[in-house]
Each structure stands twice: as C-alpha cells, then as structure tokens.
Swiss-Prot record:
GO terms for molecular function: metal ion binding. The gene is mamI. Its main location: membrane. It is found in: Magnetosome membrane. It is a multi-pass membrane protein. The chain crosses the membrane at residues 3-23, 32-52. It comes from the Bacteria. Essential for magnetosome formation. May bind magnetite. May be involved in an early stage of magnetosome nucleation. Disruption phenotype: Cells have no magnetic response and no magnetosome membranes. Deletion of genes mamH to mamV (amb0961 to amb0978) gives cells with no magnetosomes and no magnetic response. This is Magnetosome protein MamI.
Amino acid sequence: MPSVIFGLLALALGLLGVTAWWWSVTEFLRGAVPVALLILGLVALASGVQSVRLPRSNKGTASDPDIDG
C-alpha cells in the first residue's frame, strides 16, 4: 500500500512540475532525444555487427539428439 501512495504522490508532483516548467522540459527533451538516438543507434549497430560475425553452425547445440548416450 505505501508503494501505491508513493506512486500517486510522485505522479502528482511530476505532473505539477511538468506543467509549471514546461519550457524547461521541452529544452531538456530537445537536447536529450538526439543523444539518446545516437546511443541507441550505436547499440543497434554493434549488435548487428556482432550477429553477422558469429558463426552459424549447429554443432554442439542442445537441440541435437545425442546418439552416443
């Protein structure tokens, strides 16, 4: 129950802060969104390069039945 009360209080104060300092929020978002997109793009590029580099062999996977027991 305390977490619900804390959550509602945080939502109310957050909405109050966003409405009171709207232009500051938009300035922050205008600076933060491009930086976040750059970071997400680098992560996506790195994971794509890593998946291309990994060999695609099915030897030794757990899905293959073991004939020798």
